[in-house]
């Protein structure tokens, strides 16, 4: 039998397709009409509970067949049955705005008054605002298969802060695991006869919520996630009445790979501690910076000359997320190793203190100059730093980014001198003026 469903790129439709796949315990291409006839009754049993109906009002508005004042289980049942009856084979083209493989639905209830609008497809137009739709048509042109998939979509959502998070990814693996978690939550509600609505991890900030969900998925499912080219987009939305709302957040592939690498090197507990320290009243500064493409290097420091993770973890972040050249990363590491060796030979934390407290680029250069002189005094065979290395790799942009280079040097020095520093306690010795 030809496949019924095809992934469309429409986040609402695709979410519903993965829910159907998980509920039927079949691959998407193997789903049959008989599966749909068996599954649609579950929607009726669930959606007419108080908590789910409340969610549906903000997902589909009060004009949806399950939420309308005249809505009854029988009315919604008829709607779902007619969508299933209207399933037609896929073609090479069609007018459906989602799949493009079938023509518009012939189901009457889907086209009442204003056609297919926000009461059936969230965040689209409604009523007689025909200028919202292509060619001033009365509502969207969408086939019955895609409309049916959207009916399962709410199960895929996470409720968060009075709105909903919809995840969409280029990775079928990510979409499948996301659906698996949500369906497991639904089955739990059914088994306990305790209906609480869409899945929630009890985090009200959307950025914090979806980062935690991604991290939990990476930890829970044993995959080589750090080798996957995963891109994730989150839609944080509400389709409620006169105040629809949507914000879009992207998790780029390098950020996902970094989160996966944290698990790969068994640094997850330290990562949780790192991010746990980054919360403030506005959210989580580490997660927010990853979303904005800003550096999180400073957050790898615990304080008291201790760091989270190790150089390999930081290197992966620098290479994957910051897109720093590996030769430069290695040059900074090697310089830090030479400085660490020098400090231990001097048996003095003076230079380390100066490096920690320097305020500007000029002061930073002076610390390096003092260190270079110290290297000569103790008889180091090679120069601490060479000219070409300094201008070509350590600070190729001059003063720009000097403070991050300083932080990277300190990270490696703390790692290399961990035991030595620990034995000296919190000793601080001030030295020459910079």
What are these regions, as identified by a protein language model?
Residues 1-73, 416-429:
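Conserved small-residue
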Residues 29-32, 116-118, 171, 360:
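Alpha-helix initiation/capping motif
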Residues 53-203:
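Basic, glycine-/proline-tolerant helical and adjacent loop/strand elements
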Residues 2, 11, 65, 73, ...:
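Proline-rich intrinsically disordered, low-complexity coils
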Residues 196-434:
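Intrinsically disordered, low-complexity regulatory regions
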Residues 3, 15, 51, 66, ...:
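A sequence-composition feature that detects small, non-aromatic residues
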Residues 10, 32, 143, 293, ...:
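Helix N-terminus capping/helix-initiation residues
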């Amino acid at each position: 039998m030809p496949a019924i469903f095809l992934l469309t790129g429409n986040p609402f439709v695709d979410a519903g397709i993965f829910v159907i796949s998980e509920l039927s315990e079949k691959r998407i291409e193997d789903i049959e009409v008989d599966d749909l006839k068996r599954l649609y009754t579950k929607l009726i049993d669930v959606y007419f509970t108080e908590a789910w109906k409340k969610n549906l009002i903000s997902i589909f508005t009060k004009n949806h067949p399950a939420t309308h004042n005249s809505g009854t289980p029988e009315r919604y049942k008829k709607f779902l049955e007619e969508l299933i009856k209207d399933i037609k084979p896929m073609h090479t083209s069609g007018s459906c705005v989602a799949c493009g493989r079938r023509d518009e639905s012939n189901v009457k209830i889907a086209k009442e008054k204003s056609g297919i609008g926000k009461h059936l497809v969230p965040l689209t137009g409604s009523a007689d605002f025909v200028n919202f739709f292509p060619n001033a048509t009365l509502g969207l042109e969408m086939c019955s298969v895609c409309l049916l998939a959207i009916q399962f979509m709410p199960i895929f959502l996470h409720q968060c802060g009075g709105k909903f998070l919809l995840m969409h990814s280029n990775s079928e693996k990510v979409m499948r695991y996301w659906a698996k978690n949500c369906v497991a939550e639904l089955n739990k509600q059914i088994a306990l006869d305790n209906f609480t609505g869409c899945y929630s991890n009890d985090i009200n900030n959307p950025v914090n919520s979806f980062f935690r969900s991604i991290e939990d998925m990476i930890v829970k499912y044993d995959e080589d996630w750090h080798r996957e080219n995963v891109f994730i987009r989150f839609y944080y939305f509400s389709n409620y009445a006169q105040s629809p709302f949507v914000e879009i957040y992207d998790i780029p592939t390098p950020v996902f790979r970094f989160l996966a690498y944290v698990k790969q090197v068994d640094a997850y507990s330290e990562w949780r501690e790192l991010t746990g320290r980054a919360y403030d009243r506005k959210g989580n500064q580490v997660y927010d910076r990853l979303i904005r493409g800003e550096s999180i290097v400073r957050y790898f420091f615990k304080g008291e000359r201790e760091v989270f993770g190790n150089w390999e973890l930081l290197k992966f972040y620098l290479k994957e997320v910051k897109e720093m050249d590996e030769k430069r990363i290695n040059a900074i590491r090697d310089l830090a190793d030479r400085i660490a060796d020098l400090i231990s030979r001097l048996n003095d934390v003076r230079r380390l203190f100066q490096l920690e407290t320097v305020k500007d680029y000029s002061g930073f250069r002076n610390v390096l100059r003092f260190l270079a002189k110290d290297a000569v005094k103790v008889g180091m065979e090679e120069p601490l730093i060479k000219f070409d290395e300094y201008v070509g790799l350590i600070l190729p942009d001059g003063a720009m980014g000097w403070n991050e280079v300083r932080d990277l040097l300190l990270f490696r020095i703390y790692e290399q001198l961990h035991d030595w520093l620990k034995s000296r306690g919190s000793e601080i010795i001030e030295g020459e003026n910079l």
